[in-house]
């Protein structure tokens, strides 16, 4: 299958956009390092929604609208992974038992707790963005979410079975670091030093989540990758805010 068909598949897989594609999961996963590009597409949509909301609503509502639009536009897929990983982190037993809990459709206190922490912090971070960088911040946040996902995949151990292993294997490319640098430079051009810091924080966050998964579950699943997307968005926004504050921009 050509790259265009695979890219359509990746966009359809990552969003609620009803694009027709015959790409298999292996075809889609082959473009794992292109995921930040899809993140940019998502970021433009989220940023536009946030700016539009800011014209008629106060800041707190704008933050809720932007975050709500982001998780809806991505089909709530990654949010589900965040909840599942939270439940597994709170469990005890063997690695296999924790993986079983992660795949359990029921929601526990660990998942709800992690969801509350990440969602509330993300909303607060969006609310704290200066109006002049609202669009840029939301755009960089979505790109960084995908960068974080690739960072997590890069250090993860694939579990036989499931979709996550295809993305993990595809991330083991000699070009992964170049992709991270490219998006850090792009973020710098968009928002200066804070933008580059945001992407760097996302990379480190992804690696951290991957290492946490290795220690707690031995393997990583699609849920772990999904969780890294949500945490990556949050951490990149926090990094952006911290850099803005420290640099006085």
Swiss-Prot record:
<dbReference type="InterPro" id="IPR003805">
    <property type="entry name" value="CobS"/>
</dbReference>
<keyword id="KW-0812">Transmembrane</keyword>
<dbReference type="Pfam" id="PF02654">
    <property type="entry name" value="CobS"/>
</dbReference>
<feature type="transmembrane region" description="Helical">
    <location>
        <begin position="59"/>
        <end position="79"/>
    </location>
</feature>
<comment type="function">
    <text>Joins adenosylcobinamide-GDP and alpha-ribazole to generate adenosylcobalamin (Ado-cobalamin). Also synthesizes adenosylcobalamin 5'-phosphate from adenosylcobinamide-GDP and alpha-ribazole 5'-phosphate.</text>
</comment>
<keyword id="KW-0460">Magnesium</keyword>
<dbReference type="GO" id="GO:0008818">
    <property type="term" value="F:cobalamin 5'-phosphate synthase activity"/>
</dbReference>
<feature type="transmembrane region" description="Helical">
    <location>
        <begin position="199"/>
        <end position="219"/>
    </location>
</feature>
<comment type="similarity">
    <text>Belongs to the CobS family.</text>
</comment>
<keyword id="KW-1133">Transmembrane helix</keyword>
<feature type="transmembrane region" description="Helical">
    <location>
        <begin position="107"/>
        <end position="127"/>
    </location>
</feature>
<protein>
    <recommendedName>
        <fullName>Adenosylcobinamide-GDP ribazoletransferase</fullName>
        <ecNumber>2.7.8.26</ecNumber>
    </recommendedName>
</protein>
<feature type="transmembrane region" description="Helical">
    <location>
        <begin position="37"/>
        <end position="57"/>
    </location>
</feature>
<keyword id="KW-0169">Cobalamin biosynthesis</keyword>
<keyword id="KW-0472">Membrane</keyword>
<keyword id="KW-0808">Transferase</keyword>
<dbReference type="GO" id="GO:0005886">
    <property type="term" value="C:plasma membrane"/>
</dbReference>
<feature type="transmembrane region" description="Helical">
    <location>
        <begin position="177"/>
        <end position="197"/>
    </location>
</feature>
<dbReference type="GO" id="GO:0009236">
    <property type="term" value="P:cobalamin biosynthetic process"/>
</dbReference>
<keyword id="KW-1003">Cell membrane</keyword>
<comment type="pathway">
    <text>Cofactor biosynthesis; adenosylcobalamin biosynthesis; adenosylcobalamin from cob(II)yrinate a,c-diamide: step 7/7.</text>
</comment>
<dbReference type="GO" id="GO:0051073">
    <property type="term" value="F:adenosylcobinamide-GDP ribazoletransferase activity"/>
</dbReference>
């Amino acid at each position: 299958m050509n790259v265009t068909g695979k890219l359509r598949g990746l966009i359809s897989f990552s969003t609620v956009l009803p694009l027709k594609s015959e790409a298999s999961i292996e075809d889609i996963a082959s473009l794992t390092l292109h995921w930040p590009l899809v993140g940019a597409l998502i970021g433009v949509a989220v940023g536009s929604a946030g700016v539009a909301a800011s014209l008629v609503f106060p800041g707190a509502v704008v933050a809720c609208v932007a975050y709500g639009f982001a998780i809806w536009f991505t089909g709530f897929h990654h949010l589900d992974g965040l909840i599942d990983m939270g439940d597994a982190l709170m469990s005890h037993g063997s690695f296999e038992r924790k993986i079983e809990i992660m795949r359990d459709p029921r929601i526990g206190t660990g998942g709800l707790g992690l969801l509350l922490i990440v969602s509330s912090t993300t909303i607060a971070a969006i609310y704290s963005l200066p109006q002049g960088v609202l669009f840029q911040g939301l755009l960089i946040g979505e790109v960084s979410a995908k960068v974080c996902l690739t960072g997590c995949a890069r250090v993860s151990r694939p579990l036989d079975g499931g979709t996550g292993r295809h993305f993990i294997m595809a991330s083991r490319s000699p070009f992964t670091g170049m992709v991270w640098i490219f998006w850090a430079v792009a973020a710098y051009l968009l928002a200066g030093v804070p933008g580059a810091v945001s992407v760097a924080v996302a990379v480190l966050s992804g690696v951290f989540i991957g290492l946490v998964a290795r220690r707690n579950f031995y393997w990583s699943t699609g849920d772990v990758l999904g969780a890294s997307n949500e945490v990556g968005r949050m951490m990149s926004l926090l990094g952006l805010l911290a850099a803005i504050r420290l640099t006085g921009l």
